[in-house]
Regions:
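Bacterial N-terminal signal peptides that target proteins for export
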Residues: 1-9
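Hydrophobic helical h-region of N-terminal Sec-dependent signal peptides
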Residues: 9-17
Length: 385
């Protein structure tokens, strides 16, 4: 009986301890949320100079090269949008946490769109543009649009007055990703082909761009087709251009190498079907570029890692195509670029001409302010008007 009583007491103690631990974790999460919210609120209040604001939303990263790129983006926006305050957020909580821990370089604080939008609302901005720094409209863009922005407009946290929400009606807009439409893919192709380093590389051999892409089942807006369209516009200029991705079916590195060898492919993307014929390309030299806003883990590992047998760098070289992902001695340039931001080949947002394309989307979004194309708040939704 004493043994049973002891075991029962031990079980109660264990459950109690677990309950206290769970409560402690909840308290810590709540405390951290409030702490980060106060930090963002203080920044917004201190830096507010206007009643209009642009919040740029990137997925995030933990590399210095990417951090430097984000600074260039923000600086460009501040220079090109006078009268607007500009802030940057990460949509990836994992990137935010890893950046704070200093995963690859010195620790750095970034915050998610929820904290920024809370602070922006509390600062009573009158016009708000949320600009996506994604390349195509996919899973991350959906998260920004249908979670962060929607929750803000619906006053999820209950921190805004009805009067303020009414004032936001038709005064909040979302800037679309780099290749939201087919015409954007054509514009990007023209810009990339004019970049001096790309133009020189494609004149000497293959230029292969590596995008991210949406895996099967996650191509919410049919954005994957933009990679195929971009490639076709590039190849209309020079057949040494190729475009592939990390996650999109039919465009993985094996597929790109088969295209280089020569074949006909029927791309099936959503409701769109495209037959594309690739002539055999006998070039023995290739240059790889990240087709992403920044060069982070995917560019570092999936594209350029010489020690990874499955990286684009390794597989291209194994196919007897002398391939570089950086201009100088590969491994040294790669590591240097990622840790101190020098000695690398740029990703999309590092190119001034490409940043202008994103800013064009922001201007298009601004033009929608005050119109039926802007977002409405629940206080003025059609069924309540």
């Amino acid at each position: 009986m004493k043994k049973i009583k002891f075991l029962m007491m031990a079980a109660v103690a264990l459950v109690t301890a677990m309950s206290f631990t769970a409560c402690s974790d909840d308290d810590d999460n709540s405390s951290n949320y409030q702490k980060y919210q106060q930090e963002v609120t203080n920044m917004v209040n201190k830096q507010k100079k206007n009643d209009k604001v642009i919040l740029i939303v990137a997925f995030g990263s933990t590399w210095q090269q990417a951090y430097d790129t984000f600074e260039k983006v923000v600086d460009d926006y501040k220079a090109n949008f006078p009268g607007w305050d500009v802030f940057l957020s990460f949509s990836s909580i994992e990137c935010i946490n890893n950046a704070r821990e200093g995963e690859n370089v010195a620790p750095k604080d970034y915050y998610d769109p929820e904290h920024w939008l809370n602070a922006i609302g509390q600062a009573r901005y009158k016009k708000i543009v949320v600009q996506s720094l994604q390349v195509i409209p996919g899973e991350e863009y959906r998260n920004v649009r249908d979670s962060y922005v929607k929750n803000f407009m619906n006053n999820k946290n209950g921190i805004f007055t009805t009067e303020y929400l009414k004032s936001l009606d038709r005064n909040v807009v979302i800037g679309t990703p780099l290749m939201a439409e087919e015409s954007d893919a054509e514009a990007l192709a023209e810009v990339l082909n004019k970049e001096s380093d790309i133009k020189a590389a494609v004149a000497e051999g293959i230029v292969a761009f590596m995008g991210h892409g949406n895996p099967e089942g996650y191509d919410y807006y049919g954005g994957n087709i933009r990679y195929v369209q971009l490639e076709q516009y590039l190849r209309a200029i020079n057949e040494n251009y190729y475009v592939g991705t990390v996650d999109m079916d039919q465009t993985l590195v094996d597929d790109v190498l088969e295209n280089i060898a020569g074949r006909t492919v029927t791309y099936e993307v959503g409701a769109i079907s495209m037959d594309v014929t690739y002539a055999a390309n006998n070039a023995k030299k290739a240059q790889l570029y990240p087709l992403m806003s920044i060069a982070g883990d995917h560019a570092h590992n999936d594209m350029a890692d010489p020690d990874d047998e499955g990286s684009w760098f390794s597989m291209f070289n194994d196919a007897d195509i002398k391939t570089m992902a950086y201009e100088t001695t590969f491994k040294e340039a790669c590591l240097k670029g990622y840790t101190d931001g020098t000695g690398y080949i740029p990703a999309l947002a590092e190119r001034s001409a490409v940043r202008k394309l994103w800013m064009n989307h922001t201007r298009e979004a601004i033009d929608k302010l005050g119109t039926e194309d802007a977002l409405s708040t629940p206080t003025t939704a059609p069924d309540e008007e």
